[in-house]
């Protein structure tokens, strides 16, 4: 990314992960992150995982990048989570909680981070695109759909019956 001069949108230490943000050619946000060891996460007794937003050291990240061989995504790499821009985060949260059985991990006004099990988030919904976010139209550039892989088939059967 440094060699290609890909503009970074931002970066943050979230307590459970460190992330760098950029945009693709369609203006979809992309988060590249590294999960910290679980024993460093702020996991509450009720299972909620509290996140923070603190500054990353840009110079430190730049120096690390200079030492690495060219990056190749490993075979079998999976997307860890998806962020969705929505008009109403509470309605979207309720939909995904009911339809996929996801649990609240962290919620603030206008955004929720939800997950299955003890992960910090598999899906996040936010209203940061604004209340007047236009509905997606056929043929529109951008994310049309995503696929959710369920590892526990019994869970899925129970959820759907």
Predicted regions: what they are:
Residues 14, 81, 120-122, 145:
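Histidine-centered active-site/metal-ligand motif
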Residues 16, 78, 108, 142:
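Exposed loop/turn and edge beta-strand positions of beta-sandwich/beta-sheet ligand-binding modules
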Residues 37-90, 143-146:
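N-terminal beta-strand motif that seeds the catalytic metal site of vicinal oxygen chelate
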Residues 29-36, 103-140:
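Conserved short beta-strand elements that form part of the metal-binding/catalytic scaffold
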Residues 98-99, 123, 158-161:
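Long compositionally biased, domain-poor regions of proteins
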Residues 8-11, 101-106:
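Short secondary-structure junctions
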Residues 1-29, 86-90, 128, 144-161:
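Vicinal oxygen chelate
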Residues 88-104:
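Amphipathic alpha-helical segments
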